Amino acid sequence: IVDQYLLILNSINKRITNVVFMGMGEPFLNYQQVVNAANLLNHKEGINLSAKRITISTVGIIPKITQYAKEGHKYKLAISLNGSSQDQRLKIMPISKTHSMDALIQSAWDYYYISKKLITLEYVLLAGVNDDIADADRLMVLIGDLPCKLNLIPYNEIDGLFHRSSEEKIERFVNRLEHANFTVTIRWSKGTDISGGCGQLAVLDKENYK
């Protein structure tokens, strides 16, 4: 895992300021190796990257969230929410069959009670799927007073069923959350002009890579 960091670092000849464990495999299903890698990235005799610049993101493996909290790790934790209800999230993320929305939010509360640290909830906005005003209202009820940050992520389009929400819809969604009890931010991805944004990296034509 750390080799990936070093490979990129040596390729771009620039300082890498942040590391996020997510995608290309669920981090909490490779729990110990991910934690070991984060420790090496953070260690003063390793990469010496500040702990506050390292984030581990999970789709919501509840037993591992609890373990992570109890072990007292100092790296940020993020959960991919992506739905405003159990039925909706189940259609987007099959993991909801095993770990329900209510159980996931409770695990986020448990994480806060144990660690006293804010958690980030990630919410990818999908046109016509989870970007309605009613979704914003449900999120405010679902999340309630949980000490957290809701990170809204406009979808980066690739060939497939989902599409990016319009700028107008994104703005309306954000405005609806203006009076929520939690912080709301928007993550604008870079590299989308070359299909290199978050979630876009893929081999489009295998013939070109033989």
Segment roles from a protein language model:
Residues 7-185:
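Conserved AdoMet/S-adenosylmethionine-binding subsite of the radical SAM
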Residues 1-5:
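Alpha/beta-hydrolase active-site loop
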Residues 179, 189-210:
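Radical SAM enzyme core and accessory elements
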